[in-house]
Amino acid sequence: MLDMSDVALSVVQRSFTMSVRAESWRDGDLLAADIPVADGSEDRDRSLAVPERISLTVPRRDRGYTWDPGADPDHPLAAYGQQLHISYGVDIGGGDFEWIDRGWFLITETSSDDTTVTVTAQGLLTWVDEAKFVAPFQPSGTLASTIRSLVEPALTVNFDGTLVDRSVPVGMQWDSDRLGGLTEVLDAWAADAYVTEDGVLLVEPVSDDGTPVLSLTDGHGGTVMHWQGSSSRDGAFNCVVAQGEDASGNQLQGVAYDRNSASPFMFGGPFNPLAVPYTYSSPLMTTVDQCRKGAAAKLLQLRRTTSRRLAVTMVPHPGLMAGDIISATGAGLTNAPCAIETLTLPYSPSEMNLTVRVL
């Protein structure tokens, strides 16, 4: 969860007055410090290659300034490298606002009509997604240095200190997909990566552990307005097989079984008495231990889209981010740990929507 003072945390437990501050930057230069945001929203979805997307509605003309970029590539709302820095304000009393930094977003499209301008922006991994290789790329060095080669200088990378770096096997090659290469390295390293609110790519071990940052309840004094659950067998599995090869070309594999007794897909449980595997492979895994760790991490990641999920409608909480662990009471649950998989934060007075996965 993003940093918030105790005062702001208490305010967002009930209806409150909010504001959004949007700045436009390009190549380190501030182009506009106070974009007049009339409406908008922020969407985050951990299952997407670029998880973040925002939409802003801005008056075409405000305070004598035209916010329609037209054909001007240097306009604050043009889509030629302009970035939006978004902060969400909470009125903590006396007209004073506490500003929560929601992050940096790359403008991808701007359109206008007679009265309004609509701006669409996405997370900074868009740079990596767009940048296909102009020639086949052969990684060398280590997993960490390969990630730096894939994303820098577009993004600065920080690595969690608990990750153990290792050499990349020779002979690998990616033909065009830079972001796909990044995903393959992360999978082989049993790691996750996301862009922080500071615009830095943080690489850390895959994990669903953590102390709940917030308790959601529909009871007295709660902030939840509505719960809605869903379940499906589509794409379900009860084990993951990760395949690699050693330096001699011998095929290796590691298997991770879903042995969580609380999981509806538990291996050996009523979901299916037989193994239902999800299989993936990468030459970056060169030992059985690496394959086993990769399989265990992939099992956690895939559960983000196949486990029991709940849709939550609630009073907006600008500190919440995708991946945060919350505690849920309602919809048949009591203090159940859940991970936020998707969220929609309105940039005007409205309700916030979450999709949470029961852990």
Enumerate the language-model features and the residues they cover:
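Assembly/oligomerization scaffold segments
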Residues: 1-134, 187-190, 194-195, 204, ...
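Short acidic/polar beta-strand-loop edge motifs in secreted extracellular
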Residues: 43, 127-149, 158-184, 208, ...
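A generic structural motif
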Residues: 54-57, 116-122, 200-202, 311-313, ...
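Short, surface-exposed secondary-structure edge patches
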Residues: 70-77, 163, 315-319
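A structural motif
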Residues: 147-158, 244, 248
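Short, well-structured beta-strand/strand-turn elements
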Residues: 155-163, 188-200
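Acidic, small/polar-enriched beta strand-loop surface segments
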Residues: 1-31, 197, 205-350
